[in-house]
């Protein structure tokens, strides 16, 4: 599997066993001026959604986390 990896949003091959791509958006203390922080990467399971996330996308095709 290949996924986009933050901070550069470049496509990289995921480690063995990490077949899920994800994109998380969440607010930090600068959210009102800079917008949400975006994290992209690979995972073995979809990260658990928490109340601090604005959005969470998990997908299973190459580079689907754009």
UniProtKB/Swiss-Prot annotation:
Function of the protein = Postsynaptic neurotoxin that binds and inhibits neuronal nicotinic acetylcholine receptors (nAChR) with high affinity (IC(50)<100 nM). Is a selective, and slowly reversible antagonist of alpha-3/CHRNA3-containing and some alpha-4/CHRNA4-containing AChRs.
Question: Pfam families attached here?
Answer: Toxin_cobra-type
Q: Which family is this sequence assigned to?
A: Belongs to the three-finger toxin family. Long-chain subfamily. Kappa-neurotoxin sub-subfamily.
Has UniProt tagged this entry with the keyword Glycoprotein?
Answer: no
Name the UniProt record assigns to this protein: Kappa-flavitoxin
Kindly state the subunit structure of this protein.
Homo- and heterodimer; non-covalently linked.
Source organism of the structure: Bungarus flaviceps flaviceps
Per UniProt, the keywords (alphabetical) are: Acetylcholine receptor inhibiting toxin, Disulfide bond, Ion channel impairing toxin, Neurotoxin, Postsynaptic neurotoxin, Secreted, Toxin
Name the major location: secreted
């Amino acid at each position: 599997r290949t996924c986009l990896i933050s901070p550069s949003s470049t496509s990289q091959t995921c480690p063995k066993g990490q077949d899920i791509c994800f994109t998380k958006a969440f607010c930090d203390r600068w959210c009102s001026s800079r917008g949400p922080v975006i994290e992209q990467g690979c995972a073995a399971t979809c990260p658990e959604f928490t109340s601090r996330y604005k959005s969470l996308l998990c997908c299973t095709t190459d580079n689907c986390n754009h």
